Curated annotation (Swiss-Prot):
One of its GO terms (cellular component) is postsynaptic density membrane. It is found in: Cell membrane; Cell projection, Axon; Cell projection, Dendrite; Synapse. It comes from Mus musculus. Its main location: membrane. The chain crosses the membrane at residues 540-560. This is Leucine-rich repeat and fibronectin type-III domain-containing protein 3. Disulfide bonds join 317-366. Residues 425-523 form the Fibronectin type-III domain. Pfam families: fn3, I-set, LRR_8. LRR repeats lie at residues 84-105, 108-129, 132-153, 157-178, 181-202, 205-226. CDD domains: FN3 (cd00063). Residues 17-539 are extracellular. Residues 561-626 are cytoplasmic.
Length: 626
C-alpha cells in the first residue's frame, strides 16, 4: 500500500509520450486558395477582386500569386517577414506606387512579376533587398524613368530583364552594362533614340537582345556583336548564338550601318527610313555599295571679330554632311577647346568665350568631322585693350556689340571689323549664283569632266535665319538649276557636290564642286490699306446717304401721285360715284333740277346711298333717272 503514493508522486516527472503539436498557421485569406498540405506552401489569389494585399497571409509561403486584381499600391508591411518567398506575381493590377523597401525582407525571392501595371518610375530603394532575384518582368507599364541604382542589389544574379512596352527615352546604360549574368534583355516598344557605343560589351552571357520598335536611326557596332554569330531566327540556332532584333526602327542607311549589313541574317524586319533614295526599302535588299556617307562641308563661319579684353565673344561654325558632323574648336595655341570656366562649346557649332583675354587673339580653327572625313575653317579673333571703367556721369551703360568699333578699339582693328561686316563672303569661282530675285535664284557650275562616272549633282543650301538644310538632286547632264521658294531679304549659303562612283573602291562618293553665298532681294512693301476706323465710318455715312435718298424719292413719288388724282387716293377716286343734292321748295314751286353729268360709258355705276337733310318727295316728283 505504500508503493501507490510513491507512484503518484513520480507521475508528474515522467516524460510526455504524446507527439509534438504543429505550429499554428495563419488562416487562408478570403477568396484565395492555399496549398498547405505539402511544402512549399502556396497562396493563390488570381482574379479575386482584391483591392490590397491581404494582411492575413501565411508568412511561411513560398509562392504568392496576386495577379489580375485591383491592387493599387504595395506597402512596406504587406510582404514583411516573408523570408521564404520564392515566387511573387503581381501582374495585371493597377499598381502605381511601390514603397521603398517593400521587398526588403524577400531575400530568397527569385522571380518578381510586375507587368501590366501603372508604374511610371522605378527608384533606387524600391527593389532593395532582392539579392537573389533572377527574373524581373516590368513590361506593359508606363515607365519613363529608371534610376541608375535601381538594379544594384540584383545586378550579379539577374538573368532575365524585360522592360518592353514602356515609355523609356533614356536608360542607365552603365548600370545595364553591369548585368554580367543576364541572358535575355527586352527593350522593345519603347522610345529609345540612341544607344551608346559599347553599351553591351560586358554582357558576355547575353543570348537574346530585342530592341524592336524604338526610335533608333543608327546602331553603333559593339564587340559583342562581332564576337558572336548573329541569327535572326532563334529556331535552329546554336546555343552560343545571339538573337538580335532591331525591326521597326527608322534606320538611316548610310556607311555607319555597313557592319550590320555584312552580318548573315535571315527573315528579319529591318527597313530603311532614310535617306530619301533608300526610304522604304528592305534593309537586306539594299546593296552594300549603297550605304554611303557624305563628307562634311563648312557652310557658314563667323567673320573676323574684334572685341576689347574682358568682353564675351561668340564664334560660330556650321557644317553639313551625312552623318551630321560634329564640330570642335582648336585654340590659336593648338589646344582642343571644350566646356570650362571661360568657354562653352555648344552642339550646334558655337563657341562662346565668356571673358576674353589678350592671349585669346589669333586664329581659331573649326573642325567638322563625321565618318566620311572632316573639314576645317579658320576664324580670326582680335582682342583689344580693356575698356576704362564707366564714369559716374556717363550717359550710356551698354557695352558695344561684338565686332563694332568703339573708342577703345584700335583704328586698324575697327576698320578691319567694319570692312568684314559690310562685305559678303566671296563666291567660289566654280559656282555662280545669278539672276537672284526676291524668291528665286539661278545656280550655275562648270562641267566636271576630270571626275569620271558622275551620277548626279547635289545642291545643299540654307539661309542665315535657320539651320535647316535643303537638298536638291540634279541630273548629271545639268549645269544649272533654278532655286525657287526662297525667302526674301535673306542671305543663303549654298554648296554643289558631285556624286560619282569611285573607281578604286567601287563605292559611291561625293566631291565638292564649290560653294557660294548670295542674298535675295527684299520684297516690295505693299500699299497700306485704309485705316479700319476710317473705313468703317465712311461705309456708315455712305449707307446712311443711300437710305435717306431712297426715303426722299419715295415721298416725292407719293406726293406726285396724290396731286395727279385731285387730292384723293387713287383707289377711292375711281370707286366713288357722283352724288347730287336735291332739296324741295317750301312754296310749292319746283325749280329746275340741275342734272348730273353723264357718267362715262366704260365706268360702272356705283350704288351709293347718301342721306341728306331734305324734305321727302312724292312719287310724282321723283326725277326721271336713267
Amino acid at each position: 500500500m505504500a508503493v501507490l503514493p510513491l507512484l503518484l508522486c513520480l507521475l508528474p516527472l515522467a516524460p510526455a509520450s504524446s507527439p509534438p503539436q504543429p505550429a499554428i498557421s495563419s488562416p487562408c485569406p478570403r477568396r484565395c486558395r492555399c496549398q498547405t498540405q505539402s511544402m512549399p506552401l502556396s497562396v493563390l489569389c488570381p482574379g479575386a477582386g482584391l483591392l490590397f494585399v491581404p494582411p492575413s497571409l501565411d508568412r511561411r509561403a513560398a509562392e504568392l500569386r496576386l495577379a489580375d486584381n485591383f491592387i493599387a499600391a504595395v506597402r512596406r508591411r504587406d510582404l514583411a517577414n516573408m523570408t521564404g518567398l520564392l515566387h511573387l506575381s503581381l501582374s495585371r493590377n493597377t499598381i502605381r506606387h511601390v514603397a521603398a523597401g517593400a521587398f526588403a525582407d524577400l531575400r530568397a525571392l527569385r522571380a518578381l512579376h510586375l507587368d501590366g501595371n501603372r508604374l511610371t518610375s522605378l527608384g533606387e530603394g524600391q527593389l532593395r533587398g532582392l539579392v537573389n532575384l533572377r527574373h524581373l518582368i516590368l513590361s506593359n507599364n508606363q515607365l519613363a524613368a529608371l534610376a541608375a541604382g535601381a538594379l544594384d542589389d540584383c545586378a550579379e544574379t539577374l538573368e532575365d530583364l524585360d522592360l518592353s512596352y514602356n515609355n523609356l527615352e533614356q536608360l542607365p546604360w552603365e548600370a545595364l552594362g553591369r548585368l554580367g549574368n543576364v541572358n535575355t534583355l527586352g527593350l522593345d516598344h519603347n522610345l529609345l533614340a540612341s544607344v551608346p557605343a559599347g553599351a553591351f560589351s560586358r554582357l558576355h552571357k547575353l543570348a537574346r537582345l530585342d530592341m524592336t520598335s524604338n526610335r533608333l536611326t543608327t546602331i553603333p557596332p559593339d564587340p559583342l556583336f562581332s564576337r558572336l554569330p548573329l541569327l535572326a531566327r532563334p529556331r535552329g540556332s546554336p546555343a552560343s548564338a545571339l538573337v538580335l532584333a532591331f525591326g521597326g526602327n527608322p534606320l538611316h542607311c548610310n556607311c555607319e550601318l555597313v557592319w550590320l549589313r555584312r552580318l548573315a541574317r535571315e527573315d528579319d524586319l529591318e527597313a530603311c527610313a532614310s535617306p530619301p533614295a533608300l526610304g522604304g526599302r528592305y534593309f537586306w535588299a539594299v546593296g552594300e555599295e549603297e550605304f554611303v556617307c557624305e563628307p562634311p562641308v563648312v557652310t557658314h563661319r563667323s567673320p573676323p571679330l574684334a572685341v576689347p579684353a574682358g568682353r564675351p565673344a561668340a564664334l560660330r561654325c556650321r557644317a553639313v554632311g551625312d552623318p551630321e558632323p560634329r564640330v570642335r574648336w582648336v585654340s590659336p595655341q593648338g589646344r582642343l577647346l571644350g566646356n570650362s570656366s571661360r568657354a562653352r562649346a555648344f552642339p550646334n557649332g558655337t563657341l562662346e568665350l565668356l571673358v576674353t583675354e589678350p592671349e585669346d587673339g589669333g586664329t581659331f580653327t573649326c573642325i567638322a568631322a563625321n565618318a566620311a572625313g572632316e573639314a576645317t575653317a579658320a576664324v580670326e579673333l582680335t582682342v583689344g585693350p580693356p575698356p576704362p571703367p564707366q564714369l559716374a556721369n556717363s550717359t550710356s551703360c551698354d557695352p558695344p556689340r561684338d565686332g563694332e568699333p568703339d573708342a577703345l578699339t584700335p583704328p586698324s582693328a575697327a576698320s578691319a571689323s567694319a570692312k568684314v561686316a559690310d562685305t559678303v563672303a566671296p563666291t567660289d569661282r566654280g559656282v555662280q549664283v545669278t539672276e537672284h530675285g526676291a524668291t528665286a535664284a539661278l545656280v550655275q557650275w562648270p562641267d566636271q569632266r576630270p571626275v569620271p562616272g558622275i551620277r548626279m549633282y547635289q545642291i545643299q543650301y540654307n539661309s542665315s535665319a535657320d539651320d535647316i538644310l535643303v537638298y536638291r538632286m540634279i541630273p548629271a547632264d545639268s549645269r544649272s538649276f533654278l532655286l525657287t521658294d526662297l525667302a526674301s531679304g535673306r542671305t543663303y549659303d549654298l554648296c554643289v557636290l558631285a556624286v560619282y562612283e569611285d573607281s578604286a573602291t567601287g563605292l559611291t562618293a561625293t566631291r565638292p564642286v564649290g560653294c557660294a553665298r548670295f542674298s535675295t532681294e527684299p520684297a516690295l512693301r505693299p500699299c497700306a490699306a485704309p485705316h479700319a476706323p476710317f473705313l468703317g465710318g465712311t461705309m456708315i455715312i455712305a449707307l446712311g446717304g443711300v437710305i435717306v435718298a431712297s426715303v426722299l424719292v419715295f415721298i416725292f413719288v407719293l406726293l406726285l401721285r396724290y396731286k395727279v388724282h385731285g387730292g384723293q387716293p387713287p383707289g377711292k377716286a375711281k370707286a366713288t360715284a357722283p352724288v347730287s343734292s336735291v332739296c324741295s321748295q317750301t312754296n310749292g314751286a319746283l325749280g329746275p333740277v340741275p342734272s348730273a353729268p353723264a357718267p362715262e360709258p366704260a365706268a360702272p355705276r356705283a350704288h351709293t346711298v347718301v342721306q341728306l337733310d331734305c324734305e321727302p318727295w312724292g312719287p310724282s316728283h321723283e326725277p326721271a333717272g336713267p
